[in-house]
Structure formats: C-alpha cells, structure tokens
Swiss-Prot record:
Keywords: Disulfide bond, Knottin, Plant defense. Belongs to the cyclotide family. Moebius subfamily. This peptide occurs in both cyclic and linear forms. The linear form contains unmodified Trp-24, the cyclic peptide occurs in two forms with unmodified Trp-24, and with Trp-24 oxidized to form oxindolylalanine. Oxidation is enhanced by exposure to sunlight. Disulfide bonds join 5-19, 9-21, 14-27. This is Kalata-B10. GO terms for biological process: defense response. There is a cross-link at residues 1-30 (Cyclopeptide (Gly-Asp)). The keyword Nucleotidyltransferase does not apply. Probably participates in a plant defense mechanism.
Length: 30
C-alpha cells in the first residue's frame, strides 16, 4: 500500500511520501 521509493534525489529531496535521500542519490523508505 505504501508508495514505492526509488526516484533520484540529486537535490537532496524526495517527492514520494515517507521516503528519504539518506542513500543519495536514490530515495529509500524512511
């Protein structure tokens, strides 16, 4: 049910709710 993370986040921000850029440059689930 949760949105899939995985977009690139070169700017350091993720558009997908609940995702973070801690594994730069790919968004991963918080």
């Amino acid at each position: 049910g949760l949105p899939t993370c995985g977009e690139t986040c070169f700017g350091g921000t993720c558009n997908t709710p609940g995702c973070s850029c801690s594994s730069w440059p790919i968004c991963t689930r918080d």
